């Protein structure tokens, strides 16, 4: 779900296909999910396609076990002419336990036109 302010929530269930050999969320899969949330938040705010220009920071704070739900929250914290900074946090949720912040990252996204060139982000 995306709001007009560029905030998005994405829910994912950690399945065996997402796990590493230790039975927890594979870091590459966590990064993929954060990138997906960043893209959707940027595209929703800009009202046009967006591409990733950079990942300026990612932290994996705690392991996420199989069967846990991952709630990703992404929001646009800065809008330039065509570029946007998107912050993403990930909360791990299990029945009967309070949510725990397990992932966070910052992504630089760029709004693009139909030819893939930078284009003004609609605000």
PLM regions and their residue ranges:
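HotDog/MaoC-like acyl-thioester-processing domains
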Residues: 3-10, 65-66, 77-123
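Short, solvent-exposed polar/charged micro-motifs at secondary-structure junctions
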Residues: 24, 61-62
């Amino acid at each position: 779900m995306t709001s007009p302010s560029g905030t998005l929530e994405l829910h994912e269930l950690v399945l065996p296909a997402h796990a590493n050999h230790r039975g927890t969320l594979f870091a590459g899969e966590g990064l993929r999910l954060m990138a997906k949330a960043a893209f959707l938040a940027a595209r929703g705010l800009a009202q046009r396609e967006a591409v990733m220009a950079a990942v300026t920071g990612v932290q994996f704070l705690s392991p996420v076990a199989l069967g846990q739900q991952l709630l990703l929250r992404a929001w646009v914290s800065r809008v330039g002419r065509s570029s946007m900074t998107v912050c993403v946090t990930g909360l791990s949720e299990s029945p009967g336990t309070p949510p725990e912040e397990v992932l966070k990252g910052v992504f630089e996204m760029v709004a693009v036109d139909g030819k893939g060139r930078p284009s003004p982000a609609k605000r």
